[in-house]
């Protein structure tokens, strides 16, 4: 029990952090070492041999990349650190967004041989969007090609960041011997391979000049963004160690700069100073502005991070745990929650029971009696709550801002192999859909096949893999299909009438709707401009719903419709015969006619592709991209490599990984994220529509 008691710390000693990085920068290894040095893990796990604690799903162990954000808690110098492990592969940026939503701070891990890589840019921009304060760790300082100054410079060039190195590496590659702490002006070395014996000593003579110069540079960089240090700097005063720490904390929390540490997680070098940095510079829940929420009337309210306020929490992740069933991860923003109590899911308007509360350490669990503001906890017992929902104590009503999930861009048809698989499939899919809002599933009415849509080939591969492993459902998988969309290109005004009279009560719905193109970055907007009660208010939501439902199937080839603004102008109703259903049908009839008359076109997803390659292969790679209808955006140098940035239709990118490997003898790699949708060229559209 001692261990659990120790987990309850004052709120100012709590750090909720994420570790974010590019796929191979060493994020999982860094997390592992943090758990090792904070005493929560006694044998060091390694991704290379598949024993890392955070990567607890079997697929992750095999692929060596982190997929699911597991939440882990550990202790360091009387502080408690909750770590949300974030994935580093571009197909999982949704997971990253979801975890950033509930973090207070983050450690950005970079590979010192490569600096900022494409996926790091994506993740960094997401962290900017959620205003997450960050410190940085230049990892792999012992690797051939490690170059600390170059790596820091890439943070300026590619991220527009304001990095402030607080350490200087002593040597690099195989000569990497330790770090110089530029604040205390001491050298730190590690004496044993486990990294547990750390010595702090005077800076070796050969490093003295470089350290003085680096410290001067650090003070200047702090002064640029901190008034207090700037004043001292201008007056020639030397700030004290405490003043530097305080300034770095202010700068980090305000998002004005990023303290940079360095080391090698794999070799156990530099982890303790990084932990000190997490505690010193990253915010506690008290350092951040209160979270915004909305009351019943839609007025904005602030949720204060205090134990005495009513309980409010946000569900940021659902996992189906092999041992305990459905686990709902909550970030508690205010108040206190005891196990066995009831809460209200305000998003859905349902009551939920909290059977057990669990602190997680990757796949180990500790039951606790209660949780408080600031905590991250796994809850057992919630039935209806899914990702993005708000839960509150009874008699309290708050809804926190919802997360927006991107539209899927790729689909596959799956077919159960046996009758037994068929019966298990829908339950298994429901579990996966609860966990992952970026996954969609529906049954194709014409073919009867189940269609899965997701963020990329890897995303869907892993879902199919999980169906097999976790739910024991074997499926046959069709070829990946592009998630095309349809839209209109001109304004149309349509009347939709649904009238049925056949003895007894009839049906009557009548609407006049103006449909217009809205721009392809938006899905749908509905405006009610009726006046004088021509259609009673209670039927308006049914009209919107009728259009929304009809938008699932377009007229060209049955693809979902996007980019539509529908303005309800007029209509009429019948005292007896009108019903929600009648108006819903009238609205969907109007929409179908609008699609036919509004010059419908087919849209395709255009992907932002970045290929990183040695110079020798660049010509062939560009030629190949051009043959895929690519629009080459930019060519850049990145160290000794070249980067090709291009916009390419997703339909041309299937199997690209294999082609790229053969074009570059396996030396080039690429990342791909959705950029936007655009009209399919006519010749290509003809082929698609012919099927």
Swiss-Prot record:
Keywords: Cytoplasm, Elongation factor, GTP-binding, Nucleotide-binding, Protein biosynthesis. Catalyzes the GTP-dependent ribosomal translocation step during translation elongation. During this step, the ribosome changes from the pre-translocational (PRE) to the post-translocational (POST) state as the newly formed A-site-bound peptidyl-tRNA and P-site-bound deacylated tRNA move to the P and E sites, respectively. Catalyzes the coordinated movement of the two tRNA molecules, the mRNA and conformational changes in the ribosome. InterPro entries: EF-G-like_DII (IPR053905), EFG_II (IPR041095), EFG_III (IPR009022), EFG_III/V (IPR035647), EFG_IV (IPR047872), EFG_V (IPR035649), EFG_V-like (IPR000640), G_TR_CS (IPR031157). Transmembrane segments: none annotated. SUPFAM superfamilies: EF-G C-terminal domain-like, P-loop containing nucleoside triphosphate hydrolases, Ribosomal protein S5 domain 2-like, Translation proteins. Disulfide bonds: none annotated. Residues 12-286 form the tr-type G domain. The lineage of its organism: Bacteria, Thermotogati, Thermotogota, Thermotogae, Thermotogales. GO terms for molecular function: GTP binding; GTPase activity; translation elongation factor activity. Belongs to the TRAFAC class translation factor GTPase superfamily. Classic translation factor GTPase family. EF-G/EF-2 subfamily. This is Elongation factor G.
């Amino acid at each position: 029990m001692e261990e659990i008691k120790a987990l309850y710390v004052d709120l100012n000693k709590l750090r909720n952090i994420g570790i974010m990085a590019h796929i191979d920068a060493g994020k999982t290894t860094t997390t592992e070492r943090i758990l090792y040095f904070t005493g929560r893990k006694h044998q060091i796990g390694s991704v290379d041999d598949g024993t890392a604690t955070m990567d607890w799903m079997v697929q992750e162990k095999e692929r060596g990349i982190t997929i699911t954000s597991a939440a882990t808690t550990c202790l360091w110098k009387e502080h408690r650190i909750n770590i949300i492990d974030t994935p580093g592969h571009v197909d999982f940026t949704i997971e990253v967004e979801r975890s950033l939503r509930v973090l207070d701070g983050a450690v950005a891990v970079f590979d010192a041989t490569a600096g900022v890589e494409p996926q790091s840019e994506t993740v960094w921009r997401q962290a900017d969007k959620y205003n997450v304060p960050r410190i940085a760790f230049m990892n792999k300082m012992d690797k051939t090609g490690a170059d600390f100054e170059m790596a820091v410079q890439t943070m300026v060039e590619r991220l527009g960041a304001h990095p402030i190195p607080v350490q200087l590496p002593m040597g690099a590659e195989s000569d990497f011997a330790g770090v110089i702490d530029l604040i205390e002006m001491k050298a730190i070395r590690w004496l044993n391979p486990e990294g547990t014996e750390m010595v702090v000593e005077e800076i070796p003579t050969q490093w003295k000049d470089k350290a003085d110069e680096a410290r001067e540079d650090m003070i200047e960089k702090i002064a640029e963004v901190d008034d207090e240090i700037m004043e001292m700097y201008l007056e020639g005063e030397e700030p004290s160690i405490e003043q530097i720490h305080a300034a770095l904390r202010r700068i980090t929390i305000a998002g004005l700069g990023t303290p940079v540490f360095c080391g090698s997680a794999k070799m156990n070098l530099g982890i303790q100073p990084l932990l000190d940095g997490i505690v010193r510079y990253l915010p506690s829940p008290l350092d951040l502005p209160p979270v915004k929420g909305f009351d019943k009337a839609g007025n904005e309210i602030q949720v204060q991070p205090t134990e005495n306020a009513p309980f409010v929490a946000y569900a940021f992740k659902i996992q189906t745990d092999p041992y305990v069933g459905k686990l709902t991860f909550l970030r508690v923003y205010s108040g206190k929650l005891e196990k066995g109590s009831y809460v209200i899911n305000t998003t859905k308007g349902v009551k939920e029971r909290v059977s057990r509360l669990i602190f997680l350490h990757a796949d180990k669990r500790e039951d606790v009696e209660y949780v408080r503001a600031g905590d991250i906890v796994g809850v057992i017992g919630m039935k209806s709550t899914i990702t993005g929902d708000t839960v509150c104590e009874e008699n309290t009503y708050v809804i926190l801002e919802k997360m927006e999930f991107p539209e899927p861009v790729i689909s596959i048809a799956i077919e159960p192999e046996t009758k037994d698989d068929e019966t298990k499939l829908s339950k298994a899919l429901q579990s996966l859909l609860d966990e992952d809002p970026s996954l969609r599933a529906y049954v194709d009415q014409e073919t009867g096949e189940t269609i899965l849509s997701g963020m990329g080939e890897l995303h869907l591969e892993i879902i199919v893999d999980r169906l097999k492993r976790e739910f024991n459902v074997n499926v046959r998988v069709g070829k990946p299909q592009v998630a095309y969309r349809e839209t209109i290109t001109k304004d149309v005004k349509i009347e939709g009438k649904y009238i049925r009279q056949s003895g007894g009560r009839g049906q009557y719905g009548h609407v006049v709707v103006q449909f217009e193109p809205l721009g392809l970055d938006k899905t749908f907007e509905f405006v009610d401009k009726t006046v004088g009660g021509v259609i009673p208010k209670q039927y308006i939501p049914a009209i919107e719903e009728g259009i929304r439902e009809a938008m699932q199937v377009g007229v060209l080839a049955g693809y979902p419709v996007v980019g539509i603004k529908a303005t309800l102008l007029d209509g009429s109703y019948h005292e007896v015969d009108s019903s929600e259903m009648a108006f819903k049908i009238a609205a969907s009839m109007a929409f179908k006619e609008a699609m036919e008359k509004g010059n419908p076109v087919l849209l395709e997803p255009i992907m932002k592709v970045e290929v990183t390659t040695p110079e020798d292969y660049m010509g062939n790679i560009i030629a190949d991209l051009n043959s895929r209808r690519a629009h080459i955006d930019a060519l850049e140098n990145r160290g000794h490599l070249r980067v090709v940035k291009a916009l390419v239709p997703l339909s041309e990118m299937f199997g690209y990984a294999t082609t790229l490997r053969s074009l570059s003898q396996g030396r080039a790699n690429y990342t791909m994220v959705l950029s936007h949708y655009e009209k399919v060229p006519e010749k290509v559209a003809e082929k698609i529509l012919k099927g």
